[in-house]
UniProtKB/Swiss-Prot annotation:
Description of post-translational modifications: O-glycosylated. Glycosylated in the ovary of 4 day old females. Phosphorylated.
Gene name as annotated: Hmu
Induction, as annotated: By ecdysone; in embryonic cell lines.
Record topological domains on the Cytoplasmic side: 1-6
Gene Ontology CC annotations of this record: cell surface; endomembrane system; plasma membrane
InterPro entries (alphabetical): 6-blade_b-propeller_TolB-like, Strictosidine_synth_cons-reg
Entry keyword set: Cell membrane, Glycoprotein, Lyase, Membrane, Phosphoprotein, Transmembrane, Transmembrane helix
UniProt-annotated stretches for the region Disordered: 427-579
Membrane topology: Single-pass membrane protein
Chief site of localization: membrane
Subunit structure: Interacts with sturkopf.
UniProt-recorded name of the protein: Adipocyte plasma membrane-associated protein Hemomucin
Role noted for this protein: Transmembrane mucin that may be involved in cellular adhesion and the innate immune response. Membrane-tethered mucins are involved in many cell surface functions and form a physical barrier around cells to regulate cell-cell and/or cell-substrate interactions, and protect against pathogens or harmful extracellular conditions. This mucin likely acts in hemocyte adhesion as it is released from hemocytes during coagulation and is also able to bind lipophorin particles which form part of the hemocyte coagulogen.
Cellular compartments annotated: Cell membrane
């Protein structure tokens, strides 16, 4: 009885405390939009195109310990450009790391990220030798790669338009450039910086999609209240653009041209994880999931979307927990307070709780999931970008201290190409006098010659007598051998049983066959009385091909050569004898 009473008292005390936290005005954090419920489609089951595999396992780790957080990857002239922690943009050539530029200020460590800067989105300009950089803290920049001249396009202090509320951008994230030079970019959150991503996961969606017009120096808002707007992908015809909503586990399509211009719709919904940067090509889009999610492993963005009071309580409790350290650091700046505040709010602190599964999804331009790559060994965890480059998939990440890569599933396999193949002896006269069977078409044979006694012509200078009967030959599967070095001697063995033709190959001669089109000497078919030798026929003059015969390759044959057997004939008494 006392235990139940104590439990009831504790529950009542917690409820009072809970109500005080969510109802008390003025408590941090302050958000643009009020906390309210919103719906996120549950992740799809790993079936069909999403079926699990192990393609991302055993990823090769490049430049380990030399790059920290290569978030976005773009390539040109066999060089990979990426932004890393510390605010630098670097390029990678083979095993070399070269500094390209830096937007932020000098800093000591990652906990000073707001001072260092954090380049997230990168794109090559279509109007010059420029690099467009979306720095999470310092805004949208244009950097001349030849002179390193930096031009600020959109400032973080600039108030930007919204569908209902105008406000500055807090997280400059994805960026892409159209053929005409217009820059599309995303603001992931209007309430929190990137070092407070945990708070952003509790707040209501406030992301935006912008189009920056260079001639007017104006950013036009296209979409508002996106659930952490992230990567971008322009369609091949640039008639629409796709934006990743990380917090909603979906891709949203915005029409730029045509009858639906200015309208948006869901492109892909229910992704099994949180999408990040998008990599488009002619066939579709690579969609990396920076954190996987399924029914057994829900993520923080979607766990309490239908419970705004719970999200508000958690956000305020977390803000109150770090409030003393923020105040201490403002009065007396110190590394301990800075590290603690950064650890509490930064999403990297909770990556240890992420599921083991790593997933990259392939989507076509019709919004269909056509394939996926998976891994479970965390050799390439928290993938934020996929770059298909030199038959590999390079995998960017905001947290890894290396650049991972795996073999591309679309890598071309080496193939053996044979051109202008000519058979040696091509164009010579046919040397087989046996008429073709009705069941199997055979090449046209030269007219046969009938002599009183049967003989078989060999390739030696002295004739070799053989005996041939007039009985009907039944061969279900004739063996055909083509040679390129020496002429072929053909010996036909006639039997009354359904056996393949028996061939007697000489030691220094190729296999004998029943049918061939490449032998240089004719074989005569006769009605025998008694076997007597005859002198060999004169050799047929060989027509030399205009082009040399192809080089022989040592490729194993699918069939085994026939064993050397003795010649079997039927004598007048009907008995099989061997010669």
């Amino acid at each position: 009885m006392g235990l139940l009473y104590a439990l009831r008292v504790r529950i009542m005390n917690f409820m009072i405390f809970f109500l005080l936290i969510i109802l008390m005005p003025g408590l941090p954090p302050r958000t643009t939009f009020p906390f309210k419920d919103y719906i996120v489609t549950p992740p799809k089951d790993l079936k069909g195109a999403l079926e699990s595999n192990f393609h991302l396992e055993g990823a090769e780790r490049l430049l380990e310990g030399r790059v920290y957080g290569p978030e976005c990857l773009i390539a040109r002239n066999n060089e990979i450009y990426t932004g890393i922690h510390g605010g630098e943009v670097i390029k990678l050539t083979s095993n070399h790391v070269t500094h390209v530029t830096k937007i932020g200020q000098p800093c000591e460590d990652i906990y000073e990220e707001s001072r260092c800067g954090r380049p997230l989105g990168l794109a090559f300009d279509t109007q010059g030798n420029n690099l467009i950089i979306a720095d999470a803290y310092y805004g949208l920049w244009q950097v001349d790669l030849g002179t390193n001249k930096k031009t600020l396009l959109v400032s973080p202090a600039q108030e930007l338009a919204g569908k209902s509320i105008n406000r500055p951008a807090k997280i400059f994230n994805g960026v892409t450039v159209s053929k005409e030079g217009d820059v599309y970019w995303t603001d992931s959150s209007s309430d929190f910086t990137i070092e407070d991503l945990v708070f952003a996961s509790f707040a209501n969606p406030s992301g935006r999609l912008f189009k920056y017009n260079r001639s007017k120096n104006v950013s036009e808002v296209l979409l508002d209240e996106l659930a952490f707007a992230n990567g971008l992908a322009l369609s091949p015809n640039e008639d629409f653009i796709v934006v990743a909503e990380t917090g909603a586990m979906r891709l949203t399509k915005y029409h730029l041209k045509g009858a639906k211009a200015g309208q948006s719709e869901v492109f892909v919904d229910g992704l099994p994880g949180l999408p990040d940067n998008l990599t488009p090509d002619a066939e579709g889009i690579w969609v990396p999931l920076v954190q996987s999610a399924d029914s057994e492993h829900p993520n923080g963005f979607t766990l309490f979307t239908r419970f705004p009071s719970v999200r508000l309580f958690l956000a305020r409790m977390l803000a109150l927990f770090e409030l003393p350290f923020r105040y201490l650091n403002s009065v007396y700046p110190n590394k301990f307070s800075q590290r603690f505040v950064h650890f509490v709010g930064h999403m990297e602190s909770i990556t240890v709780l992420a599921p083991k599964r790593t997933t990259v999804v392939r989507v076509d331009w019709n919004g269909n999931i056509v394939g996926s790559l998976h891994g479970f060994d965390k050799s390439a965890a928290t993938v934020s970008h996929v770059l298909e480059f030199q038959d590999f998939l390079f995998l960017g990440s905001p947290t890894n201290q290396y650049l991972a890569r795996v073999k591309s599933p679309k890598a071309k396999q080496p193939t053996l190409k044979v051109r202008n193949v000519r058979v040696e002896g091509e164009g010579l006269e046919a040397s087989i006098g046996v008429p073709p069977s009705k069941a199997t078409p055979k090449p046209k044979a030269a007219p046969s010659t009938t002599t009183p006694k049967p003989t078989t012509t060999t390739t030696t200078t002295t004739p070799k007598p053989t005996t041939k009967t007039t009985t009907t030959t039944t061969t279900p599967k004739p063996t055909t051998t083509t040679t390129t070095k020496k002429p072929t001697t053909t010996t036909t063995t006639t039997t009354t049983t359904p056996k393949p033709t028996t061939t007697k190959p000489p030691t220094a001669k190729p296999s004998t066959t029943t049918t061939t089109t490449t032998t240089p000497k004719p074989t005569t078919t006769t009605t025998p009385t008694t076997p007597t030798p005859e002198p060999s026929k004169p050799k047929v003059k060989r027509t030399v091909p205009e082009k040399p015969a192809p080089v022989e390759e040592d490729i194993p044959s699918d069939t085994q050569p026939p064993k050397k057997e003795k010649l079997k004939v039927i004598n007048k008494q009907g008995v099989n004898v061997e010669l």
